[in-house]
Amino acid sequence: MKNNYTSLKSSIDKEDELKSVHEIDLEKGLLPEYNSDEESTLPPYSDHARVSNPPNTHRENHSSGTTDNSSPFLIKLLISFTSIILFNAPAVCYLKYKDAFFKNYGAAEWTLIGFWCASSLIIFTFSWYFYETWTKAVGKGIKHFLKKWRNIPMAFSEVFLFNILVGSPRVTLRHISGERWGLKCSLADHIIFAILSILVFIVETVEPGSSKINIMKRLRGDNARDATQHVNEYTAVPLREMNPESEA
């Protein structure tokens, strides 16, 4: 028996197919000539060609076996070592300024130097193993910091006031410490105070007023919160009283 097959497509559907065949994709351009005699070749825009050769394979084929490393070895080494330089630079400059760099050191001084070297090694190790994490965090912090650039003048003035208020106790501590411990106390004092000043500047720039302590305002807020909770506990209506029909 011969299968009599009649097409169910209307003339409108056939016209749409002819239009779609002759349409040109503006993004891809003209279709290249396709030789149907060669079975191994496929039209470049066919679905099978897309599956067999995805867009990412072109980059992988031309990589010649090399892996994409976003953090090369030399860059990691340079940035990690830079953190050590920034950590040690203030102390070295201060010791050079005081003309006390490796001069007349006793057991206490060498102990401090050993502790300082151990801290430098820990910082270098942390910077190396957590390179991707802390670089991304620093990048986000810098972007957020630059968005708050209008707060920089006020933050700078607050840091300046902070230095004035704490300056007199620092001088007093330096005089009390004496000649023997004066160098170490002064060095630790400078480092700690510099770190505190930088932290205050960053905090006041990102969130103005966050470093100020207003005890009365906080007490008022806590008292108001407690009073609100106290009122809500006594004014809360049980569900049974709200729905008397549920008891019935």
Curated annotation (Swiss-Prot):
Acts as a suppressor component of the dual wtf meiotic drive system, and can suppress but not confer meiotic drive by compatible poisons. Wtf meiotic drive systems promote unequal transmission of alleles from the parental zygote to progeny spores by encoding a poison and an antidote from the same locus; the poison is trans-acting and forms toxic aggregates in all spores within an ascus, wherease the antidote is spore-specific and targets aggregates for degradation by the vacuole. Residues 30-68 are annotated as: Disordered. The chain crosses the membrane at residues 73-93, 110-130, 152-172, 186-206. One of its GO terms (cellular component) is vacuolar membrane. Homomer. Interacts with other proteins that exhibit high sequence similarity. The gene is wtf1. Coiled coil: none annotated. It comes from the Eukaryota. One of its GO terms (biological process) is meiotic drive. InterPro entries: WTF. This is Meiotic drive suppressor wtf1. Keywords: Membrane, Transmembrane, Transmembrane helix, Vacuole. It is found in: Spore membrane; Vacuole membrane. Belongs to the WTF family. It is a multi-pass membrane protein.
